[in-house]
């Protein structure tokens, strides 16, 4: 809900489960054949890696998704994405803001029961399985801890703030960080341009970027 709200505020694409459809379309896959492997940990018992290549469908799909994310970002397109190790995949880019949204267990349980129409017992099992898979998936592909605040720009408890206030804070942060990232990008570009095209100031001295 929060991620979708942010995407609407900035009028940019939103990627979550629908990323599967984009990857399938790009690689001529049948969505139904790969959707079960989305953000799933690799099943080591049934897969192997030979000379750097894996036959694991989970690994293959993850690689295709990471490539899609990188290509979109490199093209200059702005977007909001949930999960898929995007914070790690795009860690070397300036104009990226990453957030980890947490919620109290009771709030997560209630929302899961309502949105998925599940009993309390089934909702608890769903949350536990989802978090376990996300944690393993993130660790497998980044060698870092899922949810560790050091890996994100900001960690926010949406139960305390509510969805709207959480989205407000994210919007303000993104506007600030992306402005700084843009200025940094322009600075790098101008520095390279001056190296290739030396200029002199009014006193005849070479112009340099600070």
Model-derived segments and spans:
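Glycine-rich phosphate-binding P-loop
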Residues: 1-6
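Post-Walker A helix-loop "phosphate-sensing" segment adjacent to the P-loop in P-loop NTPases
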Residues: 9-15
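ATP-dependent small-molecule kinase phosphotransfer cores
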Residues: 18-78
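Small-molecule kinase domains that catalyze NTP-dependent phosphoryl transfer to phosphate-bearing small molecules
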Residues: 40-47, 119-164, 190-194
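NTP-dependent small-molecule kinase module
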Residues: 70, 143-209
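RNA pseudouridine synthases
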Residues: 72-79, 83-93, 97, 111
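Conserved nucleotide-binding/hydrolysis micro-motifs of P-loop NTPases
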Residues: 86-87, 102-108, 160-162
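Conserved phosphate-donor/acceptor-positioning beta-strand/loop module used by diverse small-molecule
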Residues: 92-114, 120-130
């Amino acid at each position: 809900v929060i991620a979708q709200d942010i995407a609407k505020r900035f009028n940019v694409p939103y990627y979550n489960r629908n990323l599967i459809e984009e990857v399938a379309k790009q690689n001529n896959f049948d969505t139904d054949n790969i959707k079960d492997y989305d953000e799933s940990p690799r099943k080591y018992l049934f897969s192997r890696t030979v000379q750097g290549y894996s036959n694991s469908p989970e690994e293959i799909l993850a690689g295709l998704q990471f490539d899609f994310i990188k290509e979109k970002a490199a093209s200059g397109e702005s977007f909001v994405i949930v999960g898929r190790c995007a914070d790690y995949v795009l860690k070397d880019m300036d104009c990226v803001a990453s957030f980890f949204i947490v919620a109290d267990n009771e709030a997560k349980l209630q929302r899961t029961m309502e949105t998925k129409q599940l009993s309390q017992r089934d909702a608890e099992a769903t949350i536990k399985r989802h978090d376990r898979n996300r944690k393993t998936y993130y660790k497998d592909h980044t060698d870092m801890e899922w949810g560790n605040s050091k890996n994100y720009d900001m960690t926010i408890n949406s139960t305390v703030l509510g969805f709207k206030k959480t989205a407000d804070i994210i919007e303000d942060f993104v506007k600030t960080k992306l402005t700084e990232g843009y200025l940094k990008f322009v600075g790098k570009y101008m520095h390279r341009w001056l190296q290739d095209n030396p200029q002199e100031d009014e006193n005849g001295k070479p112009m340099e970027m600070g």
